[in-house]
Amino acid sequence: MFLAQEIIRKKRDGHALSDEEIRFFINGIRDNTISEGQIAALAMTIFFHDMTMPERVSLTMAMRDSGTVLDWKSLNLNGPIVDKHSTGGVGDVTSLMLGPMVAACGGYVPMISGRGLGHTGGTLDKLEAIPGFDIFPDDNRFREIIQDVGVAIIGQTSSLAPADKRFYATRDITATVDSIPLITGSILAKKLAEGLDALVMDVKVGSGAFMPTYELSEALAEAIVGVANGAGVRTTALLTDMNQVLASSAGNAVEVREAVQFLTGEYRNPRLFDVTMALCVEMLISGNLAKDDAEARAKLQAVLDNGKAAEVFGRMVAAQKGPSDFVENYDKYLPTAMLSKAVYADTEGFISAMDTRALGMAVVSMGGGRRQASDTIDYSVGFTDMARLGDSIDGQRPLAVIHAKDEASWQEAAKAVKAAIILDDKAPASTPSVYRRITE
């Protein structure tokens, strides 16, 4: 038996906590025997004193074990259980292609996703732009879809990592969100509750990233890889670029449209293709579905070319109560904004920089995201035909096409786009889509 205040005192004085002490505290968070004040105190001591790798692993596994941990053994699946997690960005629609692509190659992807947070778009919000799409199937239905289709994308239920939900709510109001061991534990508690064989992390870098600097993004990626592997799940991470909108669109319905066009081959943004393929390659190799990069890429290209990935996406949509002919007739089902027109720069030049965070917030301001949890989303608004870094901008090439609910909203968004995109008289050096791969 432990005392919460003695655990807090031990960490306050700079000592490492044991696995038993951490589990006692996390179980107390779950069953409400630990007060909010005690949670806040421990969070602040961790913020200032950090955690050792064994402490980080214990924290993550204790939060994972505070609720249901999915077990797929009874289904006798003939492939690995694999998933991807992104730290979030703007125009980051990779999940919608990646899940079906990996499933078409023989993996099983039980993806538990989130809603938009701040300037970043949420996968669940995007999918809810599809009429009827059910993001909360019951547990049995979720398992059936994974078994039959190979991929399902759903929301987090209250039974998964409940201690994390309470811990995070306290961190959010006590200035302890940006602690790498606490971020790592929060991300991985939910992901490891999926019962995975392998995981790939997409950690964003740049003006639209969650972490403010390259060094902090790198530190987070290394922490997640270390903790997840320590918890027994094969994990790699990619540091990917978020100095510009990843896709050619940003919003909800507009990104779903681009995802379908990507899968069918109608249109593939080159940077989106690079990042999606790189993440899929990691999943295939970690899941033992391919022996190396070349074999993985060949398999992934094949399921794009032969239509199998698009077919899997269509089957997932139908299985989750969306239209059965969605892939073939997506424009019939996706909402369209009242006003769609291009915005042009006031001067000419090359795009040298982009405030990606500001562009994400512009989508939120138009109604495409939430300022608070109770807000309703306008799924139709957003940007398409986004210009990219290095593009030559003149009176012919717009910065973007803005899809808005009315003229006033369009004008506000146009102002935000112009302010967020910087022009120069010479083109900038090109930046990679993927900066680094982290394996340990």
From Swiss-Prot:
Domain of life assignment: Bacteria
Described function: The enzymes which catalyze the reversible phosphorolysis of pyrimidine nucleosides are involved in the degradation of these compounds and in their utilization as carbon and energy sources, or in the rescue of pyrimidine bases for nucleotide synthesis.
Source organism per UniProt: Salmonella paratyphi A (strain AKU_12601)
Catalytically driven reaction(s): thymidine + phosphate = 2-deoxy-alpha-D-ribose 1-phosphate + thymine
UniProt similarity note: Belongs to the thymidine/pyrimidine-nucleoside phosphorylase family.
Entry keyword Transferase: yes
One GO CC term, this protein: cytosol
Protein's pathway: Pyrimidine metabolism; dTMP biosynthesis via salvage pathway; dTMP from thymine: step 1/2
Subunit structure: Homodimer.
PANTHER family cross-referenced by the UniProt entry: THYMIDINE PHOSPHORYLASE (PTHR10515:SF0)
Keyword Ribosomal protein carried by entry: no
InterPro entries reported in the protein's UniProt record: Glycosyl_Trfase_fam3, Glycosyl_Trfase_fam3_N_dom, Glycosyl_Trfase_fam3_N_dom_sf, Nuc_phospho_transferase, PYNP-like_C_sf, PYNP_C, Pyrmidine_PPas_bac/euk, Pyrmidine_PPase_CS
Name of the protein: Thymidine phosphorylase
Keywords assigned: Glycosyltransferase, Transferase
EC number(s) given by UniProt: 2.4.2.4
MF annotations from Gene Ontology: 1,4-alpha-oligoglucan phosphorylase activity; thymidine phosphorylase activity
Top-rank EC class of the record's enzyme: transferase
GO biological process, one term: pyrimidine nucleobase metabolic process
